[in-house]
């Protein structure tokens, strides 16, 4: 009797394991085929020459590639590192699952009330359009095609709030280099100390070497190091007009200023306030 009972238990256990394996197979197979990993991607990113990011409220961001470089709203040169991050994000982001059916409408409304509309262009041809948004805690990102349902998206292997890339204002896409020009075209640099004018100096090409005007024995190596340091100056971030109360600082005037002139006599000026 005991032996028969053990046999029945083993049979039931075997059947249970087979049923469980079958259910797991069905579940895995369904999840792997129901989500199109390429849904929000373009066939060839190298053909994309314009990216438009439209918030529901506020200034849109237009990133446009022309004459060998990316521009922001046709006003500033774009930060090349940010452009790389944008395209890496577009390339690697994939849908993980549809938002649960019970909350699809509310999530879709949330995206279209607080998110961004993304448009990718090849020349003047719109090749991809979708919406990007996130939850209030900024822990999940949603992508949604214009006539589709929202998806929870991911970059496999990372826990990121992907929507943050698309939530940046136009000023954050601006190139951070202060003196953004070809330094092979350098002509001169003038440093002006407004409260200590005796400290003023000018660096310029003098025949075949760089020197300080009025100082023939200047150390050329130190001058080159100084110019290298100036060429590498970057902004941490740009301040939007009206963001900070700077009236008193502006009225006091800059502590010093640096003006660089290139061989085409274009001037690049940096004023430093302390």
Model-derived features: where do they sit?
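Secondary-structure "cap/kink" motif recognition
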Residues: 1-274
